[in-house]
């Protein structure tokens, strides 16, 4: 071992100074990752969680919480005297999103590559053969997230791989634990970790968390990690943890006058704002990317809705400075596409911009994010911190900028200051957008919309979804719909016309452009051919209705609404039959889902009950009615069971 390495490990704040000391292979991993010393949350957590104590950790975003629980969990599993029994789970890590669960899993896999016995088993995770048995303790992880694999496939992998640590989202974890093949007795199970606990509850996973806790022994170690402790999280702590030690890691900074103020973000992160009209936001983004020194390798731009992300991902390719690639990530993407896009962004070799919603605002530890831009301020001010925290992680310098429209929105700065999240006007790099810059950007976007009807329609949907999101903003005194400049907003989106919305009633929907939007074609030839055929059919039906009205016929025969009212009873009965068939299909689907959620013993008991009820009903149907009995026996009554009432 080189002398320099020994001296580095003995530095008071280094990893080697921790007591009890970390295993050499763990130190090798930390050194290879460039982590010279533990962060405050890691040091505080190691002192307690490595012992036999539950912990509740509240720490700012980007403070290194992932390693704060992964290292103690792995150490605990490897301290076992004997290898885990087959199909016995020793640890579970719960994450609110697929992306975060996948990231934790990947960090753990890279970590275990430095532990030779565990690294030897990692290739079996992707094979079809059972992993070999071991005579020494190892860590074998399995990732459980919905969308990418089916529950049956996860169970098959579990039976083949026999992992002792599960990492996943609440729904899929609860589903796997409900099977009789997965065992977590008190003799085997060691530790439970709930990461981003506040987010778990915000997303409505309380029922799944209750189910998971019910499957696990009460005698266990539990770690709860969160950026904030709400009342709901406090209730979860009461139910799921036993005499926990609370660890709160704060960041403090000096304000004017030497006043010490707590911060909820790392000191390495600069948080700023710019005041700009909506029409100038995209040009301002371009200037930030172009003028920031050094040039940002990875940037994240947050929008308020999925449709906005989808739209701007289509139109910004010709707007952003040369050399920047665009990747989109939002909740309406298929899980496989989301995972692929996330990997593209993380592994990008050239400057890349991620356009996303709040799906990427929590927990994701994306390396080397230099710039975060909030095109739309979040509807929940708590999310603001988490968005900013994607940059400036683990001591790396980062810049986070939020764009505010002139007027009442500038009050957002004071609101954040009250909530211990001070932001300052952006001074560097300088951003100075002119009206000509805004006109040029909108004209380029509009040219794309005029060339492809798909972009035109997507722009309309994106704008409507943004308006709905703005209306639902929690800070209604600051974000007021009545104060919006709709024409300027439309220019920022590059709209060819305002969509039909109650909020823009009475305004010139054409925006003074006088564009015949009906003539805009689809770039896809097949879609355009279908559109033209439907348009021609609509024109014929319209002409027929007008001709019938002119002749005094009233147009009932061709008007779809009136035709429905005057429909023959036979036709209505046919519709009722179709509806009844659909209801029956839905009932069977619900029943199948209910049976699928049962354990094997529960399904066996349900089958026996169904058979008994069917037999009783069959006998009841074959038995004579009371009237027939009376006629046949002269009114003599019997005590024969006549079945259940339906």
Curated annotation (Swiss-Prot):
Biased composition annotated in UniProt, kind: Basic residues: 582-591
GO BP field: assembly of large subunit precursor of preribosome; maturation of LSU-rRNA
Alphabetical UniProt keywords: ATP-binding, Coiled coil, Helicase, Hydrolase, Nucleotide-binding, Nucleus, Ribosome biogenesis, RNA-binding, rRNA processing
Stretches with biased composition (Basic and acidic residues): 539-548, 566-581, 600-621
Ranges in coiled-coil conformation: 572-623
Tagged with keyword tRNA-binding: no
Residues engaged in binding ATP: 59-66
Stretches the record annotates as Disordered: 539-646
CDD domains cross-referenced by the UniProt entry: DEADc_DDX55, SF2_C_DEAD
Role, per record: ATP-binding RNA helicase involved in the biogenesis of 60S ribosomal subunits. Binds 90S pre-ribosomal particles and dissociates from pre-60S ribosomal particles after processing of 27SB pre-rRNA. Required for the normal formation of 18S rRNA through the processing of pre-rRNAs at sites A0, A1 and A2, and the normal formation of 25S and 5.8S rRNAs through the processing of pre-rRNAs at sites C1 and C2.
GO cellular component terms, A-Z: 90S preribosome; nucleolus; nucleoplasm; preribosome, large subunit precursor
Gene: SPB4
Major location (coarse): nucleus
EC number: 3.6.4.13
Taxonomic placement: Eukaryota, Fungi, Dikarya, Ascomycota, Pezizomycotina
Chain location of the short sequence motif Q motif per the record: 15-43
Extent of motif DEAD box: 195-198
Domain Helicase ATP-binding residues, every copy: 46-247
Protein's organism: Chaetomium globosum (strain ATCC 6205 / CBS 148.51 / DSM 1962 / NBRC 6347 / NRRL 1970)
Reactions this protein catalyses: ATP + H2O = ADP + phosphate + H(+)
Gene3D superfamilies in alphabetical order: P-loop containing nucleotide triphosphate hydrolases
UniProt protein name: ATP-dependent rRNA helicase SPB4
Family statement drawn from the similarity comment of this UniProt entry: Belongs to the DEAD box helicase family. DDX55/SPB4 subfamily.
Helicase C-terminal domain sequence ranges: 284-434
